[in-house]
UniProtKB/Swiss-Prot annotation:
The chain crosses the membrane at residues 20-40, 63-83, 116-136. Belongs to the G-protein coupled receptor 1 family. Residues 41-62, 137-149 are extracellular. It holds the Pfam family 7tm_1. Residues 1-19, 84-115 are cytoplasmic. This is Melatonin receptor type 1A. Keywords: Cell membrane, G-protein coupled receptor, Membrane, Receptor, Transducer, Transmembrane, Transmembrane helix. It comes from Sus scrofa (Pig). GO terms for biological process: G protein-coupled receptor signaling pathway. GO terms for molecular function: G protein-coupled receptor activity; melatonin receptor activity. InterPro entries: GPCR_Rhodpsn (IPR000276), GPCR_Rhodpsn_7TM (IPR017452), Mel_1A/1B_rcpt (IPR002278), Melatonin_rcpt (IPR000025). GO terms for cellular component: plasma membrane.
């Protein structure tokens, strides 16, 4: 995204020093994201998957926050960035080939479909887990036991 939409600023933004700072910032943010799990006791053994995992029924507010910040916000950011890239590509293509009636070409449509498929596959893979989290957060006592075991081990 940065290389395509902000090409003039890319070299300055992604210098060696700034790249190292980004890696360090990502490590710090990862640790910050893990700390609430340790403090709230949301990491518990789940016999359905034979592993220690995030227990969605411990805190409704925390589960909702996890879904919002770890799924919904990234989805909105990805949508925004894909749209910006797509609009920029179309603007450049239309500027390069001015026509009286610019139309969407098959190649442009295929590129858009490819980007859309990647996004949809990401959403399909992660949405069920997050929507289950929201369902459990809405009523932990009754919803948690109703989640089928096969959903976690499939």
């Amino acid at each position: 995204y940065c290389y395509i939409c902000h090409s003039l600023k890319y070299d300055r933004w992604y210098s060696n020093r700034n790249s190292l700072c980004c890696v360090f910032l990502i490590c710090v943010l990862t640790l910050v994201a893990i700390v609430p799990n340790l403090c709230m006791g949301t990491l518990q053994y789940d016999p359905r998957i034979y592993s220690c995992t995030f227990a969605q029924s411990v805190s409704s507010a925390y589960t909702i926050a996890v879904v919002v910040f770890h799924f919904l916000v990234p989805m909105v950011i990805v949508i925004f960035r894909y749209l910006r890239i797509w609009v920029l590509v179309l603007q450049i293509r239309w500027r390069a080939k001015p026509e009286n009636n610019p139309r969407l070409k098959p190649q442009d449509f295929r590129n858009f479909v490819t980007m859309f498929v990647v996004f949809v596959l990401f959403a399909i893979c992660w949405a069920p887990l997050n929507f289950i989290g929201l369902a459990v957060a809405s009523d932990p006592a009754s919803m948690a036991p109703r989640i089928p075991e096969w959903l976690f081990v499939a």
